[in-house]
Design a protein with these regions (language model features):
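FAD-binding core of flavoproteins
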Residues: 1-80, 201-206
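Alpha-helical interface subdomain recognition
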Residues: 58-206
């Protein structure tokens, strides 16, 4: 009707609404939604035009922030599993955690996770205060992608062959970390968006 964006809520079993099961990286239940000649009544319309655009932007921002916190939890767990494993796994009669190279890589994971934690808290606190958090959420997503990538690789490296064994749960966290890294835009994409905001004087400008 020329109103631009429209946000609607449809019954799952409405005529023309088709959900197809998808096989995704995380093995979680996800579906592809197809709408075919669906009739939308006035009672199903939640927002139109500018209000719809604002609602969609808010949902996208909150979803990205939630994804970042999920990435934080998965990164933290993978790091702690690695710390526990290297403290128990012995080589040359001592735990491999006592080797300097192992300790340094694990320490880098800890630093990464804490940096991601702080960025997540900053983004979420601004969302909770109801102020513009677009820059902070984008920064958190950059950290979420990069940290998840580095922690996943380090965890697999320090676990050796054990890390890819399906009987050991680390692989589950690594699939989450990879999935979250690419979901809703890679680090490169979000960095480019931040760069555009800076160039336009919309970010980090007094």
């Amino acid at each position: 009707d020329g109103d631009g964006a429209v946000v609607v809520m449809l019954p799952r079993k409405a005529e023309g609404v088709v959900l197809e099961a998808m096989e995704v990286t995380t093995y979680e239940p996800q579906y592809r939604l197809t709408l075919s000649n669906v009739r939308v009544g006035a009672e199903n319309i939640l927002a139109r035009g500018e209000q719809a655009q604002q609602l969609l932007a808010s949902v996208a921002e909150h979803t990205m922030a939630a994804l970042c916190t999920h990435q934080l939890g998965a990164s933290d767990k993978a790091m702690r599993m690695t710390a526990s494993y290297t403290a128990e796994r012995q080589q040359f009669g001592v735990p491999i955690a006592t080797f300097q190279a192992v300790g340094h890589r694990a320490a880098n994971c800890f630093i990464d996770v804490e940096c991601l934690r702080l960025n997540c808290y900053q983004a979420i606190s601004r969302l909770d205060d109801g102020v513009d958090a677009s820059v902070e959420v984008a920064i958190a997503k950059v950290w979420a992608g990069d940290v998840g990538h580095r922690v996943s690789y380090a965890a697999q490296h320090l676990h050796g062959g054990t890390g890819i064994d399906r009987d050991y749960p680390l692989w589950r966290y690594c699939t989450w970390l990879r999935h979250n890294e690419m979901m809703l835009g890679s680090s490169a994409r979000n960095l480019a968006a931040l760069g555009s905001k800076i160039a336009a004087g919309e970010a980090f400008c007094a």
